[in-house]
Amino acid sequence: QTNQGFLRNCNQAAKAARGKYVMFLNNDTQVTEGWLSSLVNLIESDSTIGMVGSKLVYPDGRLQEAGGIIWNDGSGWNYGRLDDTDKAKYNYVKDVDYISGAAILLSTALWKQIGGFDERFAPAYCEDSDLAFEVRKAGYRVVYQPKSKVIHFEGISNGTDGNGTGLKRYQVENSEKLKEKWKEEFKNQCVNNGNPNPFRARERSMGKKIIVVIDHYVPTFDKDAGSKTTYQYLKMFLKKGYVVKFLGDNFLHEEPYSTTLQQMGIEILYGDHWATGIWDWLKLNKDEID
């Protein structure tokens, strides 16, 4: 048997899948506790979710990607690359344009319906972005799960030189193929003006209303009536389709309540820097908040 490259190897191996889900995990990764169960729990929590993926972290602890962004010009971002993985904006469940194929999970039925990775992108690169667009075309969402943390030794498998002789050279070529295939869909992506604000692009909130809720602290909804009321309001906003941000006046990340809200898709603005940073954040994003 010969190595057919990432894409064709995945397509070939997935033909043998007999389980409910197909999980793709790169051979240059190291998983952490709960990485798989958190993916499965998320995809099983909502029938509109078609594919889920992990938070990717470099071996030195810095963030590699908290979901990916595709701009209207076809350019892409690994959102949060080289930043602090513990920042609030990287730790809530959210829709994303794509998730790098180093760690993604989707149902076997949907995988077969789509037909697997599109072989025009063989041997590798952009097949994961393309798959995400195919999942949405089929009527499902692509969602990032921060609780699934996977360490990715990026570059070890495929090299790092985009213009060299390794597989990385296909990155530029396949980017053009991706733009051509999805040129109509790209018209609805967030605009790259040279220095774009990723506020909406990072969570595919284009066309949605965004609400910021400020209270004394993260609602301890099983302890007091006020918190329970706030919690019910937050759930109501989500049900109505709002994108919800929450700021506790004490700027704390309080468990298990903070994680509960984050897993519902609420971004919690926690950390001491928010005591002064909230004003800069509001100034930067004021036109996006309803």
Q: Where do the PLM segments sit?
A:
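Glycine-rich, basic loop-to-helix element that forms the pyrophosphate-binding segment
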Residues: Q1-A17
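Short aromatic/hydrophobic "clamp" motif used to bind/position activated sugar donors
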Residues: V22
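Catalytic metal- and UDP-sugar-binding loop of GT-A-like glycosyltransferases, i.e.
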Residues: L25-N27
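Conserved donor NDP-sugar-binding/catalytic core segment of glycosyltransferases
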Residues: T29-W71
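A short, conserved alpha-helix in the catalytic core of glycosyltransferases
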Residues: E33-V40, N91, D95-G115, R120-I151
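C-terminal, non-catalytic tails of nucleotide-sugar-dependent glycosyltransferases
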Residues: G50, D60-G61, D73-D95, S100, ...
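A short, glycine/small-residue-rich beta-strand->loop->alpha-helix junction that serves as a flexible
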Residues: Y217-T229
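N-terminal strand-loop element at the rim of the active site
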Residues: G241-L269, H273-T276
